[in-house]
Each structure stands twice: as structure tokens, then as C-alpha cells.
A protein has these predicted regions:
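N-terminal Rossmann-like FAD-binding beta1-loop-alpha1 element of flavoenzymes
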Residues: 3-30
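Conserved Rossmann-like nucleotide-cofactor binding loop
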Residues: 13, 36, 168
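Glycine-rich FAD pyrophosphate-binding loop
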Residues: 22-49
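Flavin-dependent oxidoreductases
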Residues: 174-175, 187-218
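Conserved FAD/dinucleotide-binding core of flavoprotein oxidoreductases
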Residues: 209-262
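Rossmann-fold NAD(P)-dependent oxidoreductase module
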Residues: 20, 117, 121, 192
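Conserved N-terminal helical subregion
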Residues: 74-174, 182-187
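N-terminal FAD cofactor-binding segment of flavoenzymes
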Residues: 45-87
């Protein structure tokens, strides 16, 4: 069956686009290489390491497509303030929701929570055809648009294709789209830590000579001592830090963060 639109990649971007277009009258298919199943969630679940900072604008989009309630019913951590400073102590800047006459600056949300809420909204409406566990192998352009050949041999056709399949996009590669790439020579260490002090519903970021270190507030069952960290360092330093035991890693992290939260 010829579709009007095929979105390749059911991540946060592809799924949000599918929801935004579901009432346009277009025939839409959303395909992904992984399973398209909503995962069970409990408030006591451990935090996933990958999180996103959702701004007020992102919240409005997710509300309009019907996914926001599914996010907050799972787990979303609002932040009211943001504190940014440099490693030498010569500069800092602060932002606050109060100064912006807003309730919050945004929310820190685990990517899997956003993904499951989007998928839940798609399944509840049923107007977008979902095809999971389907990897793209061939892509051909023809007079009517595009034909996609999947790894199971099935062929899908559409007048328009959206490549939402990530940084290493198969669609982009098969379509021959050129890219300009460079290596920042940095690695990011991401994990969740429980701090001595409350995170104060604030996002914190320190800029060091090696790269930025961010502490993003998380809450689990009312416990506001958790933070998701993103620590950008050189490859060699990342390997050294990852080889440390938990106590030594926490000591190094505390020093790098100037013990702002203990």
C-alpha cells in the first residue's frame, strides 16, 4: 500500500512528528528497527542514564500531541533555577523561573519516559501505522516517490520519507546525503548520582578546562537528592575515571563540582 508519508525512526523526534501529523488526513507509517512496545514503569525504578531537558516550548508541543500527561504520570523532575560558573571562579550566571515570571524553567525527563509516553499516545489513537523490528536495507526513488526494502523483504512505498533515524541515519546514507563531520575529542560520562544535599530543583553546570560538568535534578518517590550528570572530558580522562571504583569516582566528581551538593 502506498502511504503519503513514511517516518523512519520512532525515537522522540520521529514519534512526535507522527503524532503532530496524525489528524491531517495523511496516510502515515512509522517504522523502526527496534520493538515498538510500551515498557512497564514503576516510580521506584532506577533512573535511566540518558535524560533530556525539556523546555516550556517542548512541553507545549508534547501537550498538543497528547503525550505530556503520559510523561508526568511516570516521572518528570521540574527545575526552577539554573546555576552556571567557570572553573577559575571568574564568572557565573544564574537563571530563575521567578525572574522569568514562569512556574518552571523546564523539566528533566528520562528519554525512555518520553519515548514510552509518545508510543502510548500513538497506540491509543491508532491513526498511524506502526512497524517495529524492521530495519531498512534498500532505498529507491521512483516516479511516485520512494520504495523502502526492509530486512524481512517487505517493501514499503511513500511519496515522502522523513529520516528520523538518528546521527548514523541509514536513510541519509542510502540516499547519498553528504555530511560534514568532525571529532570534538571528548567523551561524555553519563550516570545518576545521589548527592548529600538536595538538588534544590536546580540545574547546575561548571565549565572546566577539560569540558563542562552538568548536574541535572531528578526526583524519585519524593527524594530530591538525585542528579543526572553529564561529564565531558578527554578520551584518556574518561577511561581513567571509568576505571575507578565507586568511592574514588565520587571523590573525583565532588572535586570537579566543587562539592556544591556535598
Amino acid at each position: 500500500m502506498q502511504a503519503d508519508l513514511i517516518i523512519v525512526g520512532a525515537g522522540m523526534v520521529g514519534s512526535t512528528l507522527a503524532l503532530a501529523l496524525q489528524d491531517t488526513g495523511l496516510t502515515i507509517k512509522l517504522v523502526d528497527g527496534g520493538p515498538l512496545e510500551v515498557q512497564p514503569f514503576k516510580p521506584s525504578d532506577s533512573f535511566e542514564p540518558r535524560v533530556s531537558a525539556l523546555s516550556a516550548a517542548s512541553q507545549r508541543i508534547l501537550q498538543r500531541v497528547g503525550a505530556w500527561q503520559g510523561i508526568v504520570s511516570r516521572r518528570a523532575s521540574p527545575y526552577l533555577d539554573m546555576h552556571v560558573w567557570d572553573g577559575s571562579g571568574t564568572g557565573h550566571i544564574d537563571f530563575s523561573a521567578a525572574a522569568s515570571h514562569a512556574d518552571v524553567l523546564g523539566h528533566i525527563v528520562e528519554n525512555r519516559v518520553v519515548q514510552d509516553a509518545l508510543l502510548e499516545a500513538l497506540k491509543s489513537r491508532g491513526s498511524v501505522e506502526l512497524k517495529g523490528n524492521a530495519r531498512l536495507e534498500q532505498l529507491q526513488q521512483n516516479d511516485n516517490g520512494w520504495t523502502l526494502t526492509m530486512d524481512d523483504g517487505q517493501q514499503l512505498s511513500a511519496g515522502l520519507i522523513v529520516a528520523a533515524d538518528g546521527a548514523n541515519s541509514t536513510v541519509r546514507q542510502l540516499a547519498g546525503c553528504e555530511t560534514r563531520e568532525w571529532d570534538y575529542l571528548h567523551h561524555a560520562i553519563v550516570t545518576s548520582v545521589r548527592c548529600v544535599e538536595s538538588n534544590q530543583q536546580a540545574a547546575w553546570q561548571r565549565f572546566t578546562d577539560e569540558g563542562p560538568l552538568a548536574f541535572l535534578p531528578l526526583q524519585r518517590e519524593g527524594d530530591a537528592h538525585w542528579c543526572s550528570i553529564v561529564w565531558s572530558v578527554t578520551e584518556a580522562e574518561a577511561q581513567r575515571l571509568m576505571a575507578l571504583d565507586d568511592d574514588a569516582f565520587c571523590q573525583a566528581l565532588g572535586r570537579a563540582f566543587e562539592y556544591r551538593l556535598g
